[in-house]
């Protein structure tokens, strides 16, 4: 199968990011042209190290650029309590000499976009700081972005504060800018990602699959979004799944705003499902997932990996 969708992946590895990167690399429908890192689950130095370790593990020559170390206006609040202090606890990766590109992520994204023969798809599975910086410094790049597919937000409850999902809550100002940008946005938030559970039976079969299955199984043993006994949630993998199998998702066009001021609600995505605010839709919001179909696709895409 010839890869038909050219993508750039912005990520903050992160254990479930490792699964998403595997899918982005090995799904035959996708052509991953650049990886960029951002501070989120852990510091940007750690997310960059983790991404480089994964690329070395897979012997991949995909270029990688390090991105923002802090949110636009706030100090970083990370998720080491979910992913471990390193961000990818549980597997001993071998040493390597790989380094990121010399230029920052938002410039690397700009360069790839402006040199592409046609608009490309951005996939953001961490805080939206790098995407906001791109739009702030190079607004002309928007014409070269086919769409932005993101993992973030929620139409209901949060997983970082009572109402806010982690990726949006880490940098709500960046998220607000992105949702106001006019980009075509597909939002895969907690409404679907909490459904994207890999069962214990599925997880127990991973080590026999290949080297990648063994590595991911080791990481998932240390992942605190679920457990090996009850199943683990593949939040970030949903964004990649939508690219390849959009029919697995139920989407609705909605107006989405990001709260930046509230004492208790900063980082909340206000998803106007019923159109009560009278604002035009600015996102396609995923609200339901075919879980069995998702698990089948995950098994297929992991089998493509070495």
From Swiss-Prot:
The active site is at residue 235. Gene3D superfamilies: Ribonucleoside hydrolase-like (3.90.245.10). Its EC number is 3.2.-.-. The keyword Hydrolase applies. GO terms for biological process: purine nucleobase metabolic process; purine nucleoside catabolic process; pyrimidine nucleobase metabolic process. Keywords: Glycosidase, Hydrolase. GO terms for cellular component: cytosol. One of its GO terms (molecular function) is purine nucleosidase activity. It comes from the Bacteria. Transmembrane segments: none annotated. InterPro entries: Inosine/uridine_hydrolase_dom (IPR001910), IUNH (IPR023186), Nucleosid_hydro_RihC_nonspecif (IPR022976), Ribo_hydro-like (IPR036452). Hydrolyzes both purine and pyrimidine ribonucleosides with a broad-substrate specificity. Belongs to the IUNH family. RihC subfamily. This is Non-specific ribonucleoside hydrolase RihC. It comes from Salmonella typhimurium (strain LT2 / SGSC1412 / ATCC 700720).
